[in-house]
C-alpha cells in the first residue's frame, strides 16, 4: 500500500519552534511528529510513503533516510514549487500513488490520534466506493465543518455543513483518508482544496463514506493544542499500560502521565506531573515543579523553578525560582533569568529574558 502525508509549508502556527526545525521533525511525546505517522503506516503494511513538502526539504532527508532503513519502506519527498493546498499534492505524486491499483492513505501531518489504518483499509474495501474519510466526534460541532450522512445509511456522506448554527451532527473531518487511485482523475495540478472541491464532487456521485475514529484525536499544529495533544497522547499510553511512562511509584511523580527520556537527569525533591514530557539530555534541578509541559532535548530547568503549560525549546534554560505558565513557548537556545515570571507568549530563538513578561507577548 501507499500513503501521502501532507506536510505543507512554514509551520507558522507552531512558531517559534518551527523557526529552527520543520514542523514534522519537532518532537511530540519524545518522538518526531512524522515518526508517529510513519510507524503506524508501516505497521499497517504501507511500503511507499510520499511527503508533500514546500519548506526546507533538505533538513528532512537525513531523518527520512534513517526511517527508510528502520522500517524497510520507500519514502519520497514531493517538492511543491508553490503551495498546492490539500488536493494538488495528490496529482503531483501521481507516479507513486498510481504505481498499482491498490488504495492509498492521505493524512495531515498535524494530526495525532490512535491511527486506525488497518481497520480503515478493511472498511474501505468492504464498501467498495472511491473514498473514505475518518471522522471524529466533538462536543462543540458549531466550531467545525460537520459531516452529515444520507438518511438510513450509516456511512455514506450526504453533505458537509460548515459551522452549523443548528445541530445537524457531531462528526467532523479528522484529516485522515483512504482513496482508490481513480480519485486522482478528479484533481488538477494546481492549488486546490480536497475539502472544498474534491469531496463535494465525490459526495454528488455517492462515492464518499465516513469511518468513525475510536480514541483520542487532536490537531497539534499550534502550541495550546500541542500541549493538549500531549496530554491526550500520554493518557492513551497510560490506558495501554505502556512501560515507556515513568512509574507512578517514583517519589517525584505526581498524577502520572509522565514520559522521561533515560538520558535526562532529575534533581532532588522535584514534583513532576501530571502530563509532562522530558526529552533527551534534559537537566532538571532540585525542587522543580513541572506540570502539563514539554521539555525538549538539551534544555535545562534550574532549582525551584515552576513550569506549567509551557514548551521549553531545545537547549533553552529556565533560571532558578523562575515561573513559566499560560502557554509559554521558548524557541531554541532561549535563556530565562533567575526569578523571572513569564505569563504566556512566544520567545524567539537565542533570546535572553531579564525582565518579567506579565502579559502574553511575542518577544523577538
From Swiss-Prot:
First-level EC class: transferase
UniProt cross-references to InterPro entries, sorted A to Z: GMPPB_C, GMPPB_N, Hexapep_transf_CS, Mannose-1P_guanyltransferase, NTP_transferase_dom, Nucleotide-diphossugar_trans
CDD domains for this protein: LbH_M1P_guanylylT_C, M1P_guanylylT_B_like_N
E.C. number(s) listed in UniProt: 2.7.7.13
Biological process terms in GO annotation: cell wall mannoprotein biosynthetic process; GDP-mannose biosynthetic process; protein glycosylation
Cell compartment(s), UniProt: Cytoplasm
Pfam families: GMPPB_C, NTP_transferase
Record's GO cellular component terms: cytoplasm
GO MF annotations, alphabetized: GTP binding; mannose-1-phosphate guanylyltransferase (GTP) activity
PROSITE patterns in the record: HEXAPEP_TRANSFERASES (PS00101)
Pathway: Nucleotide-sugar biosynthesis; GDP-alpha-D-mannose biosynthesis; GDP-alpha-D-mannose from alpha-D-mannose 1-phosphate (GTP route): step 1/1
Catalysis: reaction(s): alpha-D-mannose 1-phosphate + GTP + H(+) = GDP-alpha-D-mannose + diphosphate
Keyword terms of this UniProt record: Cell cycle, Cytoplasm, GTP-binding, Nucleotide-binding, Nucleotidyltransferase, Transferase
Entry-linked Gene3D superfamilies: Hexapeptide repeat proteins, Spore Coat Polysaccharide Biosynthesis Protein SpsA, Chain A
Alphabetical list of SUPFAM superfamilies matching this protein: Nucleotide-diphospho-sugar transferases
Family: Belongs to the transferase hexapeptide repeat family.
Function: Involved in cell wall synthesis where it is required for glycosylation. Involved in cell cycle progression through cell-size checkpoint.
Stated name of the protein: Mannose-1-phosphate guanyltransferase
Organism: Neurospora crassa (strain ATCC 24698 / 74-OR23-1A / CBS 708.71 / DSM 1257 / FGSC 987)
